[in-house]
Amino acid sequence: MRVNNGLTPQELEAYGISDVHDIVYNPSYDLLYQEELDPSLTGYERGVLTNLGAVAVDTGIFTGRSPKDKYIVRDDTTRDTFWWADKGKGKNDNKPLSPETWQHLKGLVTKQLSGKRLFVVDAFCGANPDTRLSVRFITEVAWQAHFVKNMFIRPSDEELAGFKPDFIVMNGAKCTNPQWKEQRLNSENFVAFNLTERMQLIGGTWYGGEMKKGMFSMMNYLLPLKGIASMHCSANVGEKGDVAVFFGLSGTGKTTLSTDPKRRLIGDDEHGWDDDGVFNFEGGCYAKTIKLSKEAEPEIYNAIRRDALLENVTVREDGTIDFDDGSKTENTRVSYPIYHIDNIVKPVSKAGHATKVIFLTADAFGVLPPVSRLTADQTQYHFLSGFTAKLAGTERGITEPTPTFSACFGAAFLSLHPTQYAEVLVKRMQAAGAQAYLVNTGWNGTGKRISIKDTRAIIDAILNGSLDNAETFTLPMFNLAIPTELPGVDTKILDPRNTYASPEQWQEKAETLAKLFIDNFDKYTDTPAGAALVAAGPKL
């Protein structure tokens, strides 16, 4: 066996990292466990052992991604292809960075990593060998190496022997940029990408998700340009090989609804769809743990064991975890290798073409039906809208819904114009004869959330085909086709108007929501394709 798979300090010098005497290459889980619990570690490097066997770490002030500190080098590679924050009507996080400032940031990170004991993890992003990225992660922090080992696809010994990285991620979490003001950047922290050098730099933030979502943003750039759909969704497959994908923003039920004892999980967050079918980008899951209980979500709870890595949870002195405590952040998380879930697709997280495409929304306005069947144009319209709404409490106890529109149910991670993702998705759907549905997991006129029991019955009706055979009627204003009845679902809730004391109450709320949809979609009307889709949306 070659030491470090033949990776030498000289090879790191090619990236600008010098004077490295100790490389820990693709460490085993056992070694990472020892490293994280090393009593000499201080600050955010230190791990704490919990009673479930998993190590817990803190990520400091950054307990989520830092979208305002995200930059992409604008050069000949990206100038005409990237969806830039400073061009067009759409708002996004893709702020341009000059090649000169990139060189300065790269100097800061390589200086931070030089002369240190480094962890180097080689892994794949993408379960399809033809289109996967071979990524090399370089960090001085053991638990960050653990995080990427959990989240990305772990190569076999044979694959490692011939590993040539397509992309380099240098994580300099301990360094910051003192010249940020002169360079007109957002802050001293940075998450920067260079598509020509094929490199990501991280400075100032310890949050592990920057590495996960950074590579997702890169797949979101590279794949659609090859005609492959790149999707922020979960996916599962039934006994007959029938594949379903679930799009949805945070809190709409992506993970919960795709974790189904009757079906095998392909993945819970990031997927591609190519000529062979749907494939996972990842080798692990990154689940929210706030208010987690063994009773409500046994699969996730049972996945928290040795080799899982908890982030920002409260660990009591006896090692037990207070999952209800959100004092550090509501965004408490756990990463674990996908095989910690029993019911998964093996040995590779991929399956055939999807025939059911489900858009999940949690409508706090109480306007949208629990389920509707979409036309091809409505599919594009609702995909580009990416709507959900949260209930935000105010001090007087009045709860006003807050709408969120996030293009393609993942605007934060898009690298190309949203219409490009919609076009690729629709092409894939048409070729596979796939049907799309809009499922509201939120509220209705009763003021209560639609029950998980009803939602699961709706998903079953979609997946077993009974919804496609049901009689439908059209909901006015939104022109959505709603089934008149479904097995196992309370018929009264299918028409949202029936859940109000009077139809006028629904009408009033519907007008408010319809206007929000129309105003949001205006940003897509600067292209002929976008303008043509306006008719598929609500009409006042």
Swiss-Prot record:
Superkingdom of this protein's organism: Bacteria
This protein's encoding gene: pckA
Keyword Transport carried by entry: no
Cofactor(s) the protein needs: Mn(2+)
Cofactor binding note from Swiss-Prot or TrEMBL: Binds 1 Mn(2+) ion per subunit.
Disulfide bonds: none
HAMAP family found in the cross-reference section: PEPCK_ATP (MF_00453)
Protein name: Phosphoenolpyruvate carboxykinase (ATP)
Biological process (GO), any one: gluconeogenesis
Source organism per UniProt: Shigella dysenteriae serotype 1 (strain Sd197)
Catalytic activity, reaction form: oxaloacetate + ATP = phosphoenolpyruvate + ADP + CO2
InterPro entries linked to this entry: PEP_carboxykinase_ATP, PEP_carboxykinase_C, PEP_carboxykinase_N, PEPCK_ATP_CS
